[in-house]
Amino acid sequence: MYKEKRISKGEFVRIRGLNYHVRTWPGIDASLPPLVLVHGWMDVAASYQFMVDAFSDAFAAGRTIIAPDWRGFGHTPSARDGQADSYLFADYLADLDFLLDHYAGDRPVDLVGHSMGGNVAMMYAGVRPARIRKLVNLEGFGLPANTPAQAPGRYVKWINELKTLHRGELTLKAYDALEGVAQRLMKTNRRLPLDKATWLAAHWSQPNSAGKWEILGEAGHKVSSANLYQVEETLAIYRSITAPVLAVEASDDSLSLWWKNQYSLAEYHERLRQVAQCTIAVFEDAGHMLHHDQPQALAQLIEGFLD
């Protein structure tokens, strides 16, 4: 199994009534801005371990690195009592704001977000521009444009999926053994080697009382949002970002693989033109989980950008 180079400290912080699980790698130089890493959908904070291990000794020793499990993922619950049956995207922004109050106070931070976490990071940087010094967006593309005419159908879909969830028909697969979880991760990402997949599986799942390995993500995350994605609102927020932004993409073009003709890289790049200072970087031989596929190269790029 993969052996981590830098051991994180796991702790729980009370955030908006939830016991938020946060991994930290403490640094020795309090004058440096904290580096905050936020993960994507159906992922966990530990997903950044390979990238953290790839940072140079000087960089990793100097900065405090902070990586939370979003609500309903990893070891962070989604509700004070039980599990939420649907999620509001704005809650991630508020959770992040409270987390920064706790860990950074009034100091600006450097923020890295992957996928859904990249979307949160971009929105947050426009809502609270003074709190972000620099931002790295790892394939946080946003979503395809919608039309108002889609609203009735979206509400119907949301309600129907809630009923499916409450009937127990919208679940996450459980696995007989940890090896099964590792194989699932390798099937999703063909570049992920067995040693890293096994390590990730142990942090991405846990055994239940019956001995089955369950994914550390709540089924409510599979329910569609009741709210349509608002491109014009997103662009207005992008225009409010003052921090330099590094937008990193993988050569596999996962955006086209997911959305086909609904949303393209060209459209995403056009949206990024609304950000005052934005640089785009593309990683070869990488897919959507580029922090797993190219951790050394990504760590080096981030260090140079944050310098």
Residue ranges and their predicted role:
Residues Y103-A151:
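Conserved hydrolase catalytic core segment
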Residues T24-D81:
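Conserved HGGG/HGGXW glycine-rich cap/lid loop of the alpha/beta-hydrolase fold
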Residues Q274-D307:
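Catalytic active-site module of serine/aspartate enzymes centered on a nucleophile-bearing elbow/loop
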Residues L172-L257:
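Alpha/beta-hydrolase
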Residues S240-A286:
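Conserved loop-alpha-helix segment in the C-terminal half of the alpha/beta-hydrolase fold
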